[in-house]
Each structure stands twice: as structure tokens, then as C-alpha cells.
């Protein structure tokens, strides 16, 4: 029996969840969101564990709390609100800003070590942004409904500013006709 590291274990669970959801197309949309959220939290935990716990020696309980909070907040705001209305790069940049602020506050308040919270938050947010880019591609392909995305884009792009143009700069008035 071999021992797997966190990345191998997460990859296998992600592949199994993707295979399970593709075989069972009768699963509701809620199950797809639960699988996506669980995968996001698991990978966020694995990534933050490597960076914050192994590199910066933060406690595992703090890392787990940060990963759970960040996973829920970024899934609801970045993946469900920003991504369907914009594109992948914009949503990834929004996730970078959100994760950087959340990580900076949590690392500053939850850890008691002699490292720079700014550097730890910046490195963690940058690594999470790379993951978010590929996670957004997965969401767009497998989780978000095509009708939902089309409905949002049609509703958001309804403002069309147009200008009227006239043949004359000065309109004819009754006084000009009398002369």
C-alpha cells in the first residue's frame, strides 16, 4: 500500500467526482455545485497547507479555518457572481484581490509567527489565482448552466447607447418661412 501526498489524493478525488458526475447526468445542479465547492475547499486547504504550514509554520487549525472561509466566500462571490457575468481572467483577478485581502487579515490575526503576513498572503493568493483560472474553466464547462450564462449576459448587456443625427444643424422655424 502506497502513501499518497495531498495533491495526488485531491487529484484522484477530483477525477472520481468528475467521472461520477458525467456518468450520472440525472444529478441535479445542486450536486454539481456541492462537488465543485468541496473540490475547491480541498484544493485550497492542500495549497494553503503547503504554503502557510510548511513554509511559514502556521498552525494547521488556522490554515483549515482560513481555507474553509476563503473557499465559501470566493465560491459564492467570485465563481457564482463574477464569473458568469464576465470572463475567466476578470474573475481570476477578482479572486486574487479577494483572496489576498482575506488571507492578509487572517494571517495577521490568526498566526503568531515571525514572518511577514504580507508576503505570505501575496504568495498564497498568487498560487490560488493560478488554481482559480483552471477551476473557472472547469466550472464553465461542467457546472454552470449554459442557459444561465446566456441569460445573464443578455440581461447585463441591454444598455445600448445610440445617438440621433439630423440633416440640419439649425431647424427651420416659422420666422424663416415668412421671409
Swiss-Prot record:
An example Gene Ontology CC term for this record: plasma membrane
Cited InterPro entries: DUF2512 (IPR019649)
Chief localisation class: membrane
Keywords of this entry: Cell membrane, Membrane, Transmembrane, Transmembrane helix
UniProt subcellular location: Cell membrane
Pfam families named in the record: DUF2512
Transmembrane segments: 33-53, 63-83, 89-109, 115-135
Bilayer disposition of the protein: Multi-pass membrane protein
Protein's name according to its UniProt entry: Uncharacterized membrane protein YndM
